């Protein structure tokens, strides 16, 4: 059995790591490189960095800190933020990123996924999906440009349909960001993640809602995800990654210690 992965997420804005609640009201958490080094030392399996306003403001993630992170850590990391061309992706990979993730740019131009896959191979192409549960229609819908509250907009895609589309186009991994759960630490959305898991032939990463160690256990066992991403519980030192992994191993979950 493949080991499950623990993935701290660092949202970056104006050169600092920030964290919001339900994608709003972001507060500064700390500096990028020291936080990355801390999580690597604690035992994170990989890191994800989102330049959260890049797509909404029509720019690409700042490469200067990407190279500094690559020099400081020895675990894989993924970078996202406004990547719209093969050249931009190539540059970020050359600066040391192991994977690149696209979200809003893929919604604007789905062919980007196929082009990235053709150029670099699907193993380093991650698709982020910002999924919002709409109670009125009892459905999951995809939102775009979520890094800037003023720029956030609805798309025509239902989450399940977009999950199938991005796989057809060649993504290697999917991060499902459950917007309703983000930052509230009430647990992952097991129902939605389980639904997506049934449609997903590539690795699925759960994002949004981690508050306790049991939440990680539950999402691995019940939703059968491949990795669990979290931010605020790590930023606020509510959960130590090494202790989390010991707990999960004791609960019978395959994990790298």
UniProtKB/Swiss-Prot annotation:
Q: What is its EC number?
A: 4.3.2.10
In terms of Gene3D superfamilies, this protein maps to: Aldolase class I
Assigned GO CC terms: cytoplasm
Q: In which pathway does it act?
A: Amino-acid biosynthesis; L-histidine biosynthesis; L-histidine from 5-phospho-alpha-D-ribose 1-diphosphate: step 5/9
The annotated active site, in chain numbering, is 11, 130
Q: Which InterPro entries match?
A: Aldolase_TIM, His_biosynth, HisF, IGPS_HisA/HisF, RibuloseP-bd_barrel
Where in the cell? Cytoplasm
Q: Set out the biological process GO terms recorded for this chain's protein.
A: L-histidine biosynthetic process
Q: Which domain of life is it from?
A: Bacteria
Record bears the keyword Lyase? yes
Name it: Imidazole glycerol phosphate synthase subunit HisF
């Amino acid at each position: 059995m493949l080991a499950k992965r623990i993935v701290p997420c660092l949202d970056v804005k104006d050169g600092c790591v920030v964290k919001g609640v339900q994608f709003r009201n972001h507060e500064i958490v700390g500096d990028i490189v020291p936080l990355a080094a801390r999580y690597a030392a604690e035992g994170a399996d990989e890191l994800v960095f989102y330049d959260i306003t890049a797509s909404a403001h029509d720019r690409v993630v700042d490469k200067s800190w990407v190279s500094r992170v690559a020099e400081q850590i020895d675990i894989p990391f993924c970078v996202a933020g406004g990547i719209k061309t093969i050249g931009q992706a190539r540059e970020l990979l050359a600066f040391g990123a192991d994977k690149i993730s696209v979200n809003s740019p893929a919604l604007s131009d789905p062919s980007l996924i196929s082009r990235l896959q053709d150029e670099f191979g699907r193993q380093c192409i991650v698709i982020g999906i910002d999924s919002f549960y709409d109670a009125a229609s009892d459905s999951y819908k995809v939102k775009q440009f979520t890094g800037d509250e003023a720029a956030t907009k609805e798309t025509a895609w239902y989450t399940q349909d977009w999950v199938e589309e991005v796989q057809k186009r060649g993504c290697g991994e999917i991060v499902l960001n459950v917007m309703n759960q983000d930052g509230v630490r009430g647990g992952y959305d097991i129902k939605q993640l389980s639904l997506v898991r049934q449609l997903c032939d590539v690795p699925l990463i759960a994002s949004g809602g981690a508050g306790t160690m049991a939440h990680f256990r539950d999402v691995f066992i019940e939703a059968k995800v491949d990795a669990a991403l979290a931010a605020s519980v790590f930023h606020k030192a509510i959960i130590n990654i090494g202790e989390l992994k010991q707990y999960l191993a004791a609960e019978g979950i395959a994990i790298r210690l």
